[in-house]
Amino acid sequence: MWFSNLICYRFKQDVSYTQEDFDKALEQDLFRPCTGQELATFGWTKAFGKHGETLSHFSQKSILVCAKREEKVLPASVINELVAEKVDLIEAEENRPVKKKEKDELKENILHTLLPQAFKKSSLQFAFIDQENGWVVVNSGSFNKAEELLALLRKSLGTLPVVPAFANYDLDVFLTDWLTNFSTPEGFAIGSDAELEEADDSGAQVKLKGHDLSCDEVKSHLETGKRVTKLALDWQERVKFMLQNDGSIKRLSYSDTLKEENADIPKEDMAVKLDADFILASEEIKQLLEELTQGLGDIDDLA
């Protein structure tokens, strides 16, 4: 339940769900394994897996959901090799070149033959809805994967009026200003990792890891006009993360003190442990996001 990457959205209006209605909506799009000719499937599964009984998990005005993706593994190199072998055979036997349209048809036929026999791999995608403060937080470092989950949630619920949380902020400006002045909003401290980028079309990058970001070398990069696109931050000495200029929050690392708060719960009570960890992690993330947005300021004031 400890989210490691965050793609965040805000509701455009107040929302309120009951678990009965929410789960009933999710049941319309349950996960099912791939059948013969399907490349992939995507649907809802129990939020706590084998340790839970319901699709969603409601706790502390937050809702945890889990989507499962299954896809068949057909390496492009294998397909291309089989197509090439078939093309060589046709050209040798019929003494004629094989044109692109025919190659495409051969590829489709090979795919059709191999799909039922292909290996399958699966992955889980978690997200939680904060009904109180209007957040949707997806545990992903990819906007495409986050949008895929939101699309499924929107399909199940019928509507999902959300927008990317940080889309209207020019985060380059904030990150560059924070590092230039080595000053951050209250509760946040600058870490030791950053990425800087030339403002011109060259896009030349400087990647700093485990670095003293207050040193003269970094100041020199900033003075020549480089902008900060990624910056490591420490919030309240409880959560460390990398804030990126696209609005994603990556590499979350929770303090030992925080993670040990539920250490007294027996491993045998896994459902209780998962619930306690979800409450702990989601409450920390919600507070972090609220303080981060306060530090960035009201978007209307920045217009």
Swiss-Prot record:
Gene Ontology MF term list: double-stranded DNA binding
Membrane spanning residue stretches: none
Keyword field: Cytoplasm, DNA recombination
InterPro entries registered for this protein in UniProt: RdgC
Location in the cell: Cytoplasm, Nucleoid
Domain of life of the native organism: Bacteria
GO CC terms: bacterial nucleoid; cytoplasm
Pfam families, alphabetized: RdgC
GO terms (BP aspect): DNA recombination; regulation of DNA recombination
Family listed: Belongs to the RdgC family.
Summary of the function given for this chain in its UniProt record: May be involved in recombination.
NCBIfam families: PRK00321.1-3, PRK00321.1-5
Name this protein carries in UniProt: Recombination-associated protein RdgC
Species whose genome carries this gene: Pseudoalteromonas translucida (strain TAC 125)
